């Protein structure tokens, strides 16, 4: 069954190198559709798509549209984009990314993972469980799954696992058989305007599942627990550390290899319980344990056996830019993480604290002036588990600077909120010398942000190794 004819013509993606756009483009290409696209610069995703035979033009221009018969855009693409303008002049339909994703989902029984944080890892964990059960799912994720080397794969079964992006509200249009809600925090307020509208969008996301579907919901988060009470006529499976959760953790311990725990599953109708004992998850942090509980809740609803759950989680290879170890130099471990919201930063640093024997040094590149502005108080209090904080310039992501919300303001704000060791980073070239003066064997440097700080994290081990050891009692 197809919803779109293969003869629809060329599908053109504006911003094809984006993590969400590239996944959809890859799946469409693998299904046999003619796909092309543009982006402002080469990146990993662009090169990957080119190797598959997809044409990608660097730079945005009306001529790049060619003979495309439909144009796909993300929320980041503005109406004045020359390709969008050319498409509309030619009466070529321009559709949002979520609309094209919805077309793919109509072919499958889809599980959509939503929430402010944890979507990408949870999507990857659910995909791993279905893979291990030999259910061969189609997957479209918001991050590179290390086991695949890509953020998308085309499977042969009826199942599909997708990350649902709530940033522009279009996730409510996704036709899902089941959904996951990991948490709900104030984010993307430039779109929603009010917290109430954000909450209402998540309510719609859950209520849109069919009567035979289900929603896995983390009731450790107060807004998700409140949402549970507002959705009476759908099957809801709660999970968390909360003792009232239907899927909950017991006997949690963590060491250098990750987390070990039991999971108790309660039947919401009969009250009967069963336990999956001695699960090993090779990831750090309670937030990742919660992500695994979401996957276990889904697995339980699909009837997957305990040994599949334990094998899949125990062999999980992680997601690119989610607590990714980029290397070690002079006994200092360097971590790259996508965390850019205060809740994510706090969770990552808590995980680093549990995994590190020495000092935790956070290097943060704030992402967008608007986010730093709207969550400034939270940014000033989310670094408590870091012994030292290095603050880089804001990664603008196309935004104009906002007075009073920049690198200097965050340094000052952290100091005023009681953080004892905070310093500004002059530029990326200054990072290795600064870390060299601060870090010692057993320490961990955690690079945080959604911008180009990932390249700094990957370069840092070699840059650090090339520097002479600092003199005793070196710079503070």
Curated annotation (Swiss-Prot):
Keywords: ATP-binding, Cell cycle, Cell division, Cell shape, Cell wall biogenesis/degradation, Cytoplasm, Ligase, Nucleotide-binding, Peptidoglycan synthesis. It is found in: Cytoplasm. Its EC number is 6.3.2.8. Pathway: Cell wall biogenesis; peptidoglycan biosynthesis. GO terms for molecular function: ATP binding; UDP-N-acetylmuramate-L-alanine ligase activity. It catalyses: UDP-N-acetyl-alpha-D-muramate + L-alanine + ATP = UDP-N-acetyl-alpha-D-muramoyl-L-alanine + ADP + phosphate + H(+). ATP binds at residues 115-121. One of its GO terms (cellular component) is cytoplasm. Its main location: cytoplasm. It comes from the Bacteria. The keyword Cell wall biogenesis/degradation applies. The keyword ATP-binding applies. One of its GO terms (biological process) is cell wall organization. Cell wall formation. PANTHER family: UDP-N-ACETYLMURAMATE--L-ALANINE LIGASE (PTHR43445:SF3), UDP-N-ACETYLMURAMATE--L-ALANINE LIGASE-RELATED (PTHR43445). Belongs to the MurCDEF family. This is UDP-N-acetylmuramate--L-alanine ligase. It comes from Paramagnetospirillum magneticum (strain ATCC 700264 / AMB-1) (Magnetospirillum magneticum). The lineage of its organism: Bacteria, Pseudomonadati, Pseudomonadota, Alphaproteobacteria, Rhodospirillales.
């Amino acid at each position: 069954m197809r919803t779109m004819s293969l003869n629809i013509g060329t599908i053109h993606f504006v911003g094809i190198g984006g993590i969400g756009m590239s996944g959809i483009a890859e799946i469409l290409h693998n299904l046999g559709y003619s796909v092309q696209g543009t982006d402002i610069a080469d990146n990993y995703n662009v090169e990957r798509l080119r190797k598959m035979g997809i044409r990608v033009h660097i730079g945005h221009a009306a001529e790049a549209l060619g003979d495309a018969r439909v144009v796909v855009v993300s929320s980041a693409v503005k109406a004045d984009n020359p390709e969008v303008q050319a498409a509309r002049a030619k009466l070529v339909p321009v559709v949002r990314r979520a609309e094209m994703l919805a077309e793919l989902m109509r072919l499958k029984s889809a599980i959509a993972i939503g929430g402010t944080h944890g979507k990408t890892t949870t999507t990857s964990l659910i995909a791993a469980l279905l893979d291990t059960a030999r259910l061969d799912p189609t997957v479209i994720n918001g991050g590179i799954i290390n086991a695949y080397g890509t953020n998308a794969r085309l499977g042969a079964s009826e199942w599909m696992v997708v990350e649902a992006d709530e940033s522009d509200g279009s996730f409510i249009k996704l036709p899902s058989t089941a959904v996951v809600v990991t948490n709900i925090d104030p984010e993307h307020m430039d779109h929603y305007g009010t917290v109430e509208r954000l909450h209402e969008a998540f309510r719609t996301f859950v209520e849109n599942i069919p009567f035979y579907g289900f929603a896995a919901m983390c009731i450790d988060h107060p807004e998700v627990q409140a949402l549970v009470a507002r959705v009476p006529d759908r099957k809801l499976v709660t999970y968390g550390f909360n003792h009232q959760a239907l899927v909950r953790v017991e006997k949690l311990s963590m060491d250098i290899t990750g987390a070990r725990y039991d999971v108790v599953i309660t039947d919401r109708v009969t009250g009967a319980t069963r336990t999956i004992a001695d699960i090993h998850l090779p990831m750090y942090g309670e937030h990742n344990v919660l992500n695994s509980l979401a996957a276990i809740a889904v697995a339980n609803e699909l009837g997957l056996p305990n040994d599949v759950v334990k094998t899949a989680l125990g062999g999980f290879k992680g997601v690119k830019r989610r607590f990714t170890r980029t290397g070690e130099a002079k006994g200092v471990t360097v971590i790259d993480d996508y965390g850019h919201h205060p809740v994510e930063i706090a969770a990552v640093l808590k995980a680093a604290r549990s995994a590190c024997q020495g000092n935790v040094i956070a290097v943060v590149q704030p992402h967008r002036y608007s986010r730093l502005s709207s969550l400034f108080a939270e940014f000033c209090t989310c670094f408590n588990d870091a012994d030292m904080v290095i603050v880089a310039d804001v990664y603008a992501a196309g935004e104009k600077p906002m007075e009073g919300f920049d690198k200097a303001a965050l340094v000052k704000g952290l100091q005023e909120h009681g953080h004892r060791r905070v310093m500004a980073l002059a530029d990326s070239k200054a990072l290795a010398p600064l870390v060299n003066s601060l870090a010692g064997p057993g320490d961990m440097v955690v690079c945080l942000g959604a911008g180009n700080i990932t390249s700094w994290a990957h370069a840092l081990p070699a840059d650090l190794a090339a520097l002479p050891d600092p003199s005793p009692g070196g710079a503070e």
